[in-house]
Amino acid sequence: MKPEEIRKLEGYLKRTLNPVIEIKARPQKDDSAEVYLGEEFIGVIYRDDEDGELSYNFSMAILEIDL
């Protein structure tokens, strides 16, 4: 993902979910970025540009031990 795109997504997630969320580019991947809550990795956000419509999908695994 481009830096401007990451900046916009990070701003949205900070306003919507938590102000300490950070999004970091993934090496050699241009369709996704890593999402962190503080220093803890919490998931991946994917860019979906299908049929001319751009959307994003956030994927987060929740371990049973964390419940």
What kind of feature is each model-predicted range?
Residues 1-67:
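Terminal leader/tail segments of proteins
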